[in-house]
C-alpha cells in the first residue's frame, strides 16, 4: 500500500525550512520593480490629461473673442453719426470703445439733469432757485401789460375825442372791462379794436377831402396859365402856395381869419384879368412870361411879405435871371416895346462891349450908382409907378448905331 505523503505528517528527520522573517523582508530593495511600473502609467495619464485640457481652452478663448468682436460691432452700429464723423478712416475697436464711453457719459449727464428738473417740478420750485428767470419773466409781463393798457387808453381817447364831459371813471371802467375780456380769452376783444379804427378811418377821409380841396383850389391859377412860368415867379412867391401846403395866401388868410378859398377865388379872377390884358397887348403870347413885378391888385393878395422882400432877389432854388447879349441883336428893335411892357418896367438897359456913342444916352436912363452888369438885371428896381413915362427913342437910336455882334465877345 502506497503512502500518501500529504496525509502523513512530515517526517521528523527532515530539517525545518527556515521561514522569512519581517526583518529580512524589510532589508530587501524592491524599488526598481515599483519605479518602472509607476512611471509608465503616470506618463500615459499626464499626456491624456493635457490633450483633453488644451482642446476646451482653445474653444473657450475663441468663443470669448467672438463675443467681444460681436459686441464691439454692435456698439459701432449704435453710435451716433456725429461721433463717427469725429474720426477719419476705419474705426478701430479701441476707438469704438472710447466713443461709446463718451456717448454714455453724455447721456448720463442729460438723464441726471432731466431727473433734477423732474424732482424740482414735483417738489415745487424752491425760493431763489430761478430768481433771474422769474425777474425777466416778470419784466416782460409788465411791459406787455403796460403796452396793452397804453394802447387801450389811446384808442379810448381817440374814440371819445369830441366828448367834452369825459371822466376818468369812464376810462377806468373801460380798462376793467378790457381786462376781464382778456382774462376770458379775448374773444370779445376784436370788436373793441375795430371800433377805434373805424373812427380813425372816418376822420381820415374828411381830412383828406379838405386837403384835396385845398391843393386843388390853390392849383387853379397854375392850370389856367397859357404859357410856362419862368424863374421870376418862383422867386416872387412861395412855392408851397401851388402845392396846397400854405404860402403867402394862407398867411394873409390867417390874419384876416377868412377861408382861403375866398381869397383864392379873388386871386383867380385877378390872374384871369392879367392874362387877358397881356393877350390884348400882344397878339401872340411871349415865349417867357415871368411875374417880375406885381400890380396893385396882385400885391393885395400877395401880402406884405412879398413887397418887403427884395425885388427879384436871389432865391434859394432859382439862379438870378440873366439876359445874354445875343438875345437882342441890333435888328430886333421892333420887339423892344413888347419887352418893356411884358418883363421889364423901364427901358431895357442892354450894354454891348465897345459901345461909345450910346453910352451917354444909356446913362441918362439908368441910375449911375446902380448900373447893372451886361448879363444881370438889377437886384432892386423901383416901382413902375415911381418912374415917369420915358420915351425909348433915344435908346432905339443908340441901338441902331451898334455894329453887328462879334462872335468872340466875352461875357
From Swiss-Prot:
Statement: the UniProt record of this protein carries the keyword DNA-binding: yes
InterPro entries: bHLH_dom, HES_HEY, HLH_DNA-bd_sf, Orange_dom
A GO CC term assigned to this protein in UniProt: nuclear body
Domain bHLH: 52-107
PTM text: Ubiquitinated; which may lead to proteasomal degradation. Sumoylation inhibits its ubiquitination and promotes its negative regulation of the CLOCK-BMAL1 heterodimer transcriptional activator activity.
Predominant location category: cytoplasm
TM helices/strands, residue ranges: none
Compositionally biased intervals (Basic and acidic residues): 248-271
Glycyl lysine isopeptide (Lys-Gly) (interchain with G-Cter in SUMO1), cross-linked positions: 279
Chain positions with Phosphoserine modification: 235, 383
Pfam families, A to Z: Hairy_orange, HLH
Subcellular location: Cytoplasm; Nucleus
Region spans: Necessary for interaction with RXRA and repressor activity against RXRA: 75-79
Induction profile: Stimulated by retinoic acid (RA). Expressed in a circadian manner in the liver with a peak at ZT10.
Subunit structure: Homodimer. Heterodimer with BHLHE41/DEC2. Interacts with ubiquitin-conjugating enzyme UBE2I/UBC9. Interacts with HDAC1, SUMO1, RXRA and BMAL1. Interacts with TCF3/E47.
Biological role: Transcriptional repressor involved in the regulation of the circadian rhythm by negatively regulating the activity of the clock genes and clock-controlled genes. Acts as the negative limb of a novel autoregulatory feedback loop (DEC loop) which differs from the one formed by the PER and CRY transcriptional repressors (PER/CRY loop). Both these loops are interlocked as it represses the expression of PER1/2 and in turn is repressed by PER1/2 and CRY1/2.
Protein's recorded name: Class E basic helix-loop-helix protein 40
Organism expressing this protein natively: Mus musculus (Mouse)
Lineage, uppermost ranks: Eukaryota, Metazoa, Chordata, Craniata, Vertebrata
Gene: Bhlhe40
Amino acid at each position: 500500500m502506497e503512502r500518501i505523503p500529504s496525509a502523513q505528517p512530515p517526517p521528523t528527520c527532515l530539517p525545518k525550512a527556515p521561514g522569512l522573517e519581517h526583518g529580512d523582508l524589510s532589508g530587501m530593495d524592491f524599488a526598481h520593480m515599483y519605479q518602472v511600473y509607476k512611471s509608465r502609467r503616470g506618463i500615459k495619464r499626464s499626456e491624456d490629461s493635457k490633450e483633453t485640457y488644451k482642446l476646451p481652452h482653445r474653444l473657450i478663448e475663441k468663443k470669448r473673442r467672438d463675443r467681444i468682436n460681436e459686441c464691439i460691432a454692435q456698439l459701432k452700429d449704435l453710435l451716433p453719426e456725429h461721433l463717427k464723423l469725429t474720426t477719419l478712416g476705419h474705426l478701430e475697436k479701441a476707438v469704438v470703445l472710447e466713443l461709446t464711453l463718451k456717448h454714455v457719459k453724455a447721456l448720463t449727464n442729460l438723464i441726471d439733469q432731466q431727473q433734477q428738473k423732474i424732482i424740482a417740478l414735483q417738489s415745487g420750485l424752491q425760493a431763489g432757485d430761478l430768481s433771474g428767470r422769474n425777474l425777466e419773466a416778470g419784466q416782460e409781463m409788465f411791459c406787455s401789460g403796460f403796452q396793452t393798457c397804453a394802447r387801450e387808453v389811446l384808442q379810448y381817447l381817440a374814440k371819445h375825442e369830441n366828448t367834452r364831459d369825459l371822466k376818468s371813471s369812464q376810462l377806468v371802467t373801460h380798462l376793467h372791462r378790457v381786462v376781464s375780456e382778456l382774462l376770458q380769452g379775448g374773444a370779445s376783444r376784436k370788436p373793441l379794436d375795430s371800433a377805434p379804427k373805424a373812427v380813425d378811418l372816418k376822420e381820415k377821409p374828411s381830412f383828406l377831402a379838405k386837403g384835396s380841396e385845398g391843393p386843388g383850389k390853390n392849383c387853379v391859377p397854375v392850370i389856367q396859365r397859357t404859357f410856362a412860368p419862368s424863374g421870376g415867379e418862383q422867386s416872387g412867391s412861395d412855392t408851397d402856395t401851388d402845392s396846397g401846403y400854405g404860402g403867402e395866401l394862407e398867411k394873409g388868410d390867417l390874419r384876416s381869419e377868412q377861408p382861403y378859398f375866398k381869397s383864392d377865388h379873388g386871386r383867380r379872377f385877378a390872374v384871369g384879368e392879367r392874362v387877358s390884358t397881356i393877350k390884348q397887348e400882344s397878339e401872340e403870347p411871349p415865349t417867357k412870361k415871368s411875374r417880375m413885378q406885381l400890380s396893385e391888385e396882385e400885391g393885395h393878395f400877395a401880402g406884405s411879405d412879398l413887397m418887403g422882400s427884395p425885388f427879384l432877389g436871389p432865391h434859394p432854388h432859382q439862379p438870378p435871371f440873366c439876359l445874354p447879349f445875343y438875345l437882342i441883336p441890333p435888328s430886333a428893335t421892333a420887339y423892344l416895346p413888347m419887352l418893356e411892357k411884358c418883363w421889364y418896367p423901364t427901358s431895357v438897359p442892354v450894354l454891348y462891349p465897345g459901345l461909345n456913342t450910346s453910352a451917354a444916352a444909356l446913362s441918362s436912363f439908368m441910375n449911375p450908382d446902380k448900373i447893372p452888369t451886361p448879363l444881370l438885371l438889377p437886384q432892386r428896381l423901383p416901382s413902375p409907378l415911381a418912374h415917369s413915362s420915358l420915351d425909348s427913342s433915344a435908346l432905339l437910336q443908340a441901338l441902331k448905331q451898334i455894329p453887328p455882334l462879334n462872335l468872340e465877345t466875352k461875357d
